[in-house]
Amino acid sequence: MSGSRVSDLSKLHLKKELTQIRKAGRVLRDPGTTSSWKSPLDSSRSVALLETPASRNGGSSSQFPIRGESSTNRRGKEKKVFLYNWKTQKSSSEKSGLAKNGKEEEEEEEDASSWTQASVNDDDDVSDARNGGDSYRREIQSASMGFRCRDTNLASQGVSKMRKSNVGSCKKKSKKKISSSRLDCLSKYQPRDDIVARNCNAGSDDTEEELSNSEDLRKVTGASPLLLKLKQKNWSRSSSRLLRANNRKEDSSCTYNSTPALSTSSYNMYAVRNPSTVGSWDGTTTSVNDGDDELDDNLDLPGRQGCGIPCYWTKKAMKHRGGCRSCCSPSFSDTLRRTGSSILCGSQSVYRRHNRHSSGGYSKQKIACRSAQGVLPLLSYGGDGRGGSSLGTGLSDDELSTNYGELDLEAQSRLDGRRWSTSYRSQDGLEAVALDGEEEEGSTPETIRSFSQKYRPMFFEELIGQSIVVQSLMNAVKRSRIAPVYLFQGPRGTGKTSTARIFSAALNCVATEEMKPCGYCKECNDFMSGKSKDFWELDGANKKGADKVRYLLKNLPTILPRNSSMYKVFVIDECHLLPSKTWLSFLKFLENPLQKVVFIFITTDLENVPRTIQSRCQKFLFDKLKDSDIVVRLKKIASDENLDVDLHALDLIAMNADGSLRDAETMLEQLSLLGKRITTALVNELVGVVSDEKLLELLELALSSDTAETVKRARELLDLGADPIVLMSQLASLIMDIIAGTYKVVDEKYSNAFFDGRNLTEADMEGLKHALKLLSEAEKQLRVSNDRSTWFTATLLQLGSMPSPGTTHTGSSRRQSSRATDDDPASVSREVMAYKQRIGGLHFSKSASPASVIKRNGNHSHEAKPFSRVIDNNCYKSSSSSQMIESEGSIASHENSIASTMMLNQRSSEKLNDIWRKCIERCHSKTLRQLLYTHGKLISISEVEGILVAYIAFGENDIKLRAERFLSSITNSIEMVLRRSVEVRIILLPETELLVVPHQTRKPEMTNKSGHLNNIAGLNAETDVEVGSSVESRSKLPMQRIESIIREQRLETAWLQTADKDTPGSIIRVKPERNQILPQEDTYRQTNVASAISSSGLTTHQWVDELNNEVKLLKIGDNGELQENLTGTRGQHCPLSPSLLHDTNFGNNKDNLGGYESGSGRVGCNILFCWNTKKTQRRSKSKQVKGTPVRSRRNRKSRFSLFNGCAKPRKAEGNIRR
């Protein structure tokens, strides 16, 4: 009765299976036409091996033949139903490995391992196996439960709830009992029954060896009608899409044939900790080893058939599913459970400790068998240690995997709780882990879409802009002088990585005569196709690349083959991002470099590369590419791609690429996608810059002081999205191009002299330089400012209000001279040189007289400009200038027919007087003011060859010579008024003519169209000589001017200090400041003399009388008379500058000075007025009155004799002071 029950139950169970399989056949799509994961053509393999469960209470082997007989008797009556592993297919060579199951389990038992072909245990099973126990009984029981679940629910079509209920029912049934019908159904597979029985009773070794042969297994497998039927319908090519369509319906579909270790770390942590265990992840079918008990195979099939493991299984559920639960380690199964996706649907090879000593002959046979079926390796390594297949080598795959061991990286990455293999979310990503130099999928020439990749240089001749680097590397290859380490540094897009690749190809090129790389040999073809095994390119920017670099350095001696003639080149990109530990490993390698190993470091930031590494490398600098080179390459690309491009647009692209060819190619590619003609406007819109035409218009408005239009145009550009910093940089670049004369004006509207650097005048050039200086200073403020738009607009407004070049020169001279009193004597030379550099262009003829200049300018009036236009364009542009010179009328009448002449006409006489009066007020010395107001007259101001020349006339030769000593002070006073660089020429005119020129109405014949001066009788040969002497050595004018100004002021200061000590309080109100050298504006306006001059209350005769009284003070007499004169007159009269007394011409010309005579008849001065005494020198040193070395540089002839008043005894000096 029990037997019939068993039979009825068996039929019922088989009927359910048939019903489920038929439902699956109606729902599932044809995998041959609808699968997206295509398997190889010869991958139609299956394994119909069934696991026989054993009772928990045990059983004898004699029971199995009896059940096998009862099952055999019903074979003819019942319809044969074979279960098919939908996810796993095996080749015949792999199936043969099942026959050796007993022998392998015995070896595993001796090693205290828990690994079987039916199940691969995780933590619990490993612990049981190590503890001894009844681990094998538990393994077989769990295997039977796993098979039972798969056997009953393989093609289940229920929803997830049905799947969960089926799983629960399977668990309950497996815990209660083992059905006899189950054993009856499995009795058809007699050899397998004996194998399972042997697992329960380990003592039946003979029966196990007799029944476990692979031939019987092949017969049973081939006799499966279900398998044959599925083969006819092309179901053998079921892909992972079939898995995705079924895994929602199935309860379990795990394979029991082989469960791989994910990595070295997973195998070591959960099994016997064999360091040589490496598994490759390629999404192929399971590997089942045969005769030699080898489970070591890292060459897996590329067909993504799937391992049959439901990725939704949890760790808890996997403990009750036998062999399937260990296919994924605990940490990896968590990831699979969380993601719910099929990350790994292929097989992984299990490598055992005892298999390391297996022979390589079987590996060759097994690989040859797979190669015959069209199976290509995904991750494989050649026998010489390079990448490639292990076919034809003497090394086993386990040894090769030990050498490379990519999955050792997983063990290192487990420190942060993540697995290296789980970072990939697809099978395509798993193919990128190869270290054999193969390119990733999608990088073949047919699939390349980027211009930078499509037109990447493949030979040295195709590299542009790096001639020095290319020549050096070519010579190194030609002469076989290869360094172990190279360092390529430079900005992005300059060809560093391309050069490294070409260099690696040239190292292994076998060409003898041609240029390397030749492109024809096998090595060059492998390199160009991306299949080179001697080139490894790693990225130091990500953690995976850094881990790979660390692994290579650690295992470099074992990776490299012995006696290899090929160079192994390792290119490490972004090496400056590598951690310090990796650099220490590199340092060990650099100290003891290996033969035929070359490292190439590529970096854009040399500062972050350790100095010790830099000193051991051959460094090559990759400069930015020239715009012309980039344009040539862009033209070639545009021609090859049939792009409609404007040549000016290519220039603009190259200019905005900043020396990077990659950026230029990317820009061109983006513009080509717009489907329009590539023009400059399109490039500007893409890059986000402002066109040169708009910049020129903005610059012209800013320089013309058009405030409203400047602000309006600046706002328009900013509203368009332009960056103020970029605008300012563009303006600065534009100004530099204009100054250099290299700017090419496209628009005719702007093709005037202002934008052509060759036609710029001195004033225009100074204005542009000043604008460039303002822009450069404002850019610094702009980068740290929060309101950049306001700063930019304010800077533009400053460009229009800039001072004229003359003001700049005068101000700079004044500032330089004002520091002279406190600086050392060497500062005078520095000031002179600086001043000379600023106005070095002002060079005049030595023998130019007023008459000759006027004549020349009159005859060639077209070469000169009227002074009125100069004044209007420069002096009166700003409000400050208009306050100094009244704006009523113009200085010269433009309607006048003689506007082209160089002399001012009658209408300008009042203006000349006004200018002369203002010049006198700005003189720093009272004596000079009196002298100029009394005897000097400004008769004309003219412009000669771009230089402003002022003619000042004196009626007496002695006064003229005296005024020439103050030439520098007079020049500075006039420059402050006119705000231009002026050359002052002092001439001698008869007194009668001198009085007529300013006070009487000019006669029409004084100036005519020819420009001659007809009615001035004093312009004779003598006048020419005098003028020639006054303008002698004009090339040294700046030097002489500054030195004379400093010397005059020091003399004046020293004389006033000496006079102040004798009569305190008498001249306090006219005492100048100590640090004052050159006149500042309104310095002496508050003095009594200045107020008297400005009020013009004194007549010429009165001024002459006061000057005569002052001269009387200089008469040398006894001390009492001198003291009395000083007491009575000093409070009312200004002191006379002692410069005349300490000059050689004073003694020679004393008879011609009109009252200047010495009482003692000696050439010299009274000691009271002399500053050149020893006591005064010491006092000036104590008070730090600088300038003594300047006096020491004076001609020794100008010093007084030791027997004069300057050398009187100290006692006499004390008496005088008392």
From Swiss-Prot:
Coiled coil: 762-788
Tissue: Ubiquitous.
Residues annotated for Zn(2+) binding in this entry: 509, 518, 521, 524
InterPro entries: DNA_pol3_clamp-load_cplx_C, DNA_pol_III_gamma-3, DNA_pol_III_sug/sutau_N, DNA_Rep/Repair_Clamp_Loader, DnaA_N-like_STI, HLD_clamp_pol_III_gamma_tau, P-loop_NTPase
Annotated keywords: ATP-binding, Coiled coil, Metal-binding, Nucleotide-binding, Nucleus, Repeat, Zinc
Stretches with biased composition (Polar residues): 32-46, 54-73, 86-95, 804-819
Residue sites binding ATP per the record: 490-497
CDD domains to which the protein is assigned, alphabetical: AAA (cd00009), HLD_clamp_pol_III_gamma_tau (cd18137)
Positions occupied by motif PEST 1: 273-304
Cysteine pairs bridged by disulfides in the record: none
Domain-level remarks: PEST motif is known to mediate rapid protein degradation.
Physiological role: Acts as a key regulator of trichome branching through an endoreduplication-independent pathway.
Protein name: Protein STICHEL
Organism: Arabidopsis thaliana (Mouse-ear cress)
Gene: STI
